[in-house]
């Protein structure tokens, strides 16, 4: 079981100070790498449709998966033809290109990819080379906008809009790896098009063995439950259950962990509540104690208005460029 170091989220700490020189070196490497793309010394793949990148500058969960689900479905509802590309973290397919289906194996394409595909109505491709994934989407599906899931630092993929998500821990101590949780300096947020705070709304709790069997949120009050989470920010999940009144016995696992039946060998009959990402990998277990806690992203109205105005304008501009207008 792994979790982010506590000192990452403390303003001052001895270990953070000791690691600061390495953090400074890391920042230099990140800036040089990004600069090589900016001046054209490294190739950037460009495409005839808008590429929307959703990501973050911190290590760990920032609510990307629920947000991408919302964005893909909202684009579809508004008449667009979206597609999604991802690296397929946690699976083997990041070494080769693969189209994701509802029946894809999380071991092959990653747990997040399977969860996304079960909740969106658009094509999705996973591959380490996101540019190749976009080309495959455009060759085989009539997409007019592509969402890049967790590709903020994947500079070889050209982009038209960048959305950075921030979770409840914000930027931690404000330092880059390894002294802090930042993948890039915090000044990177000044260059993205949108910064959206993570906000998740509880949807439902259902039994894995029989999804028709649900638990009302009111039933959680004063109920002792095992909360199991192999996600980037398990503390957020535990806090959600506690806010609903549950007495939580927390079991954090490393992100993208693949469970075994013995992981649930607790010495009691308390319910075991999993995140959606974890539940995807536990449906084979014949255990009536296993329940899934599903959530939805809550997205600010102002962002929605600004984003859809921009994406419509970008599509029109790219169409005009293709037609030589």
From Swiss-Prot:
<comment type="pathway">
    <text>Glycolipid biosynthesis; lipid IV(A) biosynthesis; lipid IV(A) from (3R)-3-hydroxytetradecanoyl-[acyl-carrier-protein] and UDP-N-acetyl-alpha-D-glucosamine: step 6/6.</text>
</comment>
<protein>
    <recommendedName>
        <fullName>Tetraacyldisaccharide 4'-kinase</fullName>
        <ecNumber>2.7.1.130</ecNumber>
    </recommendedName>
</protein>
<dbReference type="GO" id="GO:0009029">
    <property type="term" value="F:tetraacyldisaccharide 4'-kinase activity"/>
</dbReference>
<dbReference type="Pfam" id="PF02606">
    <property type="entry name" value="LpxK"/>
</dbReference>
<keyword id="KW-0808">Transferase</keyword>
<keyword id="KW-0444">Lipid biosynthesis</keyword>
<dbReference type="InterPro" id="IPR027417">
    <property type="entry name" value="P-loop_NTPase"/>
</dbReference>
<dbReference type="GO" id="GO:0005886">
    <property type="term" value="C:plasma membrane"/>
</dbReference>
<keyword id="KW-0443">Lipid metabolism</keyword>
<feature type="binding site">
    <location>
        <begin position="58"/>
        <end position="65"/>
    </location>
    <ligand>
        <name>ATP</name>
    </ligand>
</feature>
<keyword id="KW-0067">ATP-binding</keyword>
<dbReference type="GO" id="GO:0005524">
    <property type="term" value="F:ATP binding"/>
</dbReference>
<comment type="function">
    <text>Transfers the gamma-phosphate of ATP to the 4'-position of a tetraacyldisaccharide 1-phosphate intermediate (termed DS-1-P) to form tetraacyldisaccharide 1,4'-bis-phosphate (lipid IVA).</text>
</comment>
<dbReference type="InterPro" id="IPR003758">
    <property type="entry name" value="LpxK"/>
</dbReference>
<keyword id="KW-0547">Nucleotide-binding</keyword>
<dbReference type="GO" id="GO:0009245">
    <property type="term" value="P:lipid A biosynthetic process"/>
</dbReference>
<comment type="similarity">
    <text>Belongs to the LpxK family.</text>
</comment>
<dbReference type="GO" id="GO:0009244">
    <property type="term" value="P:lipopolysaccharide core region biosynthetic process"/>
</dbReference>
<keyword id="KW-0418">Kinase</keyword>
<keyword id="KW-0441">Lipid A biosynthesis</keyword>
